[in-house]
C-alpha cells in the first residue's frame, strides 16, 4: 500500500520531525509512505472571511495538485468522523482488500481545508473535538497508521 501524507506548511520543530521519522521508519515494514509538504499561503494575522477563504483556496489548489485520480483521500478535519483505533485499522485493511492501494491523508493549515479539498475527499477523519496544531497532527496520524498495521497483523503494541 502507498500512503501519502499531505500537509500545509513546513515542519520546523525538531521533536516532531524526530517522532514522525521514527514512525515512518517503523511503517517501512508494512507500507510505502511518502510525506508531501505544500507551502502555506502567507497572510497577515487578522483576516476577513473573504481573505481566509482565499488563503484556503490557494492552499487547497496546492494540495489537489498532489493527489492523483486513483487515490482514496482522507481529509483530517475537526468535524470529521471519529473512529476507534480498531475501526481505523479495519477500514485500512478493507481498502487494501478491495484494491485501494493508494491512500492520501490531508492535513490543512491553521485555517483548515478548502471546500474543494473536502469535496475531493472520499472520507473525513477526526482524532478529537479538540483543536491541535496541524504539525502535531502529522505525528499523531503516523502513530495511528502504525498502530493500525500492528492491530491488523495481531502484533503486540502498547495499549
From Swiss-Prot:
Quote the function comment for this protein: Specifically methylates the pseudouridine at position 1915 (m3Psi1915) in 23S rRNA.
Q: Which UniProt keywords apply?
A: Cytoplasm, Methyltransferase, rRNA processing, S-adenosyl-L-methionine, Transferase
**Protein name (record):** Ribosomal RNA large subunit methyltransferase H
Sequence similarity: Belongs to the RNA methyltransferase RlmH family.
Quaternary structure annotation from Swiss-Prot or TrEMBL? Homodimer.
Query: EC?
Result: 2.1.1.177
What Pfam families does the annotation carry?
SPOUT_MTase
EC class (word): transferase
**Entry GO terms, CC:** cytoplasm
Name the source organism.
Exiguobacterium sibiricum (strain DSM 17290 / CCUG 55495 / CIP 109462 / JCM 13490 / 255-15)
Catalytic activity reads: pseudouridine(1915) in 23S rRNA + S-adenosyl-L-methionine = N(3)-methylpseudouridine(1915) in 23S rRNA + S-adenosyl-L-homocysteine + H(+)
- Secretion signal, residue range per the UniProt entry: none
Q: Tell me the InterPro entries matching this sequence.
A: Alpha/beta_knot_MTases, RlmH-like, tRNA_m1G_MTases_N
Its predominant location is: cytoplasm
Q: Which of this chain's residues are annotated to bind S-adenosyl-L-methionine?
A: 76, 108, 127-132
Q: Where in the cell is it found?
A: Cytoplasm
Q: Which GO terms describe its molecular function?
A: rRNA (pseudouridine-N3-)-methyltransferase activity
Amino acid at each position: 500500500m502507498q500512503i501519502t501524507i499531505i500537509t500545509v506548511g513546513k515542519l520546523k520543530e525538531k521533536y516532531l520531525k524526530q517522532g514522525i521519522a521514527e514512525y515512518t521508519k517503523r511503517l517501512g515494514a508494512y507500507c510505502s509512505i511518502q510525506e508531501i509538504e505544500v507551502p502555506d499561503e502567507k497572510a497577515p494575522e487578522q483576516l476577513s472571511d473573504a481573505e481566509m477563504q482565499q488563503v484556503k483556496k490557494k492552499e487547497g489548489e496546492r494540495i489537489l495538485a498532489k493527489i492523483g485520480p486513483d487515490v482514496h483521500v482522507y481529509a483530517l478535519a475537526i468535524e470529521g468522523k471519529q473512529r476507534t483505533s480498531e475501526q481505523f485499522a479495519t477500514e485500512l485493511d478493507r481498502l487494501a482488500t478491495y484494491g485501494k492501494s493508494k491512500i492520501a491523508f490531508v492535513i490543512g493549515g491553521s485555517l483548515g481545508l478548502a471546500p474543494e479539498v473536502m469535496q475531493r475527499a472520499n472520507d473525513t477523519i477526526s482524532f478529537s473535538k479538540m483543536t491541535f496544531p496541524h504539525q502535531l497532527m502529522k505525528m499523531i496520524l503516523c502513530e495511528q497508521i502504525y498502530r493500525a498495521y500492528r492491530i491488523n497483523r495481531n502484533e503486540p503494541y502498547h495499549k
